[in-house]
Design a protein with these regions (language model features):
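PLD/PLD-like phosphodiesterase catalytic module centered on the HKD motif
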Residues: 1-143
Length: 143
């Protein structure tokens, strides 16, 4: 299995500085739990947020499934606490839409003007982990 994730570093939101929660603690947790068997990069934001979501489940022998949108994939949003919208696309691995999704992802993954390496923003802060866990558990977050 090959998992690649591009995350917003949560350094800016709506013109205000942020402290990296939730994505930095989440990225650290994902790397730790996967024994670093996933690859993570950060979108290189400059005041804006990288909020788009593309999830591609690939299969050469079966139909590919893609979820596209901007809905946060969190307990709060999946649990109907926030009205979100995504698009579900099913297509063959060699179809034009799947090819375009690959091209877009590879462009931002491989070009350093779009993404930076995981080490740039990784945080192992116990306090940030605690704040993230607390706000997620109690539904006190905006994510």
């Amino acid at each position: 299995m090959n998992i690649k994730i591009i995350l917003d570093p949560n350094k800016d939101a709506f013109g205000r500085k942020k402290k990296g929660i939730p994505n930095r603690p989440v990225a650290y947790e994902l790397m730790k739990k996967s024994k670093e068997n996933i690859q993570i990069k950060w979108y290189s934001t400059n005041g804006e947020q990288f909020h788009s979501k593309i999830i591609l489940f690939e299969s050469i022998t079966k139909e590919n499934t893609v979820i596209l949108g901007s809905a946060n994939l969190t307990k709060r949003n999946i649990g109907n606490k926030n009205l979100e919208m995504n698009i579900l696309l099913k297509a063959r691995h060699d179809s034009a839409p799947i090819s375009e999704i690959h091209n877009y992802f590879n462009l931002i993954w491989n070009d350093e003007k779009y993404t930076v390496n995981y080490e740039t923003y990784v945080t192992k802060s116990f306090w940030k982990q605690l704040v993230y866990r607390f706000t997620e558990f109690w539904g006190a977050s905006t994510y």
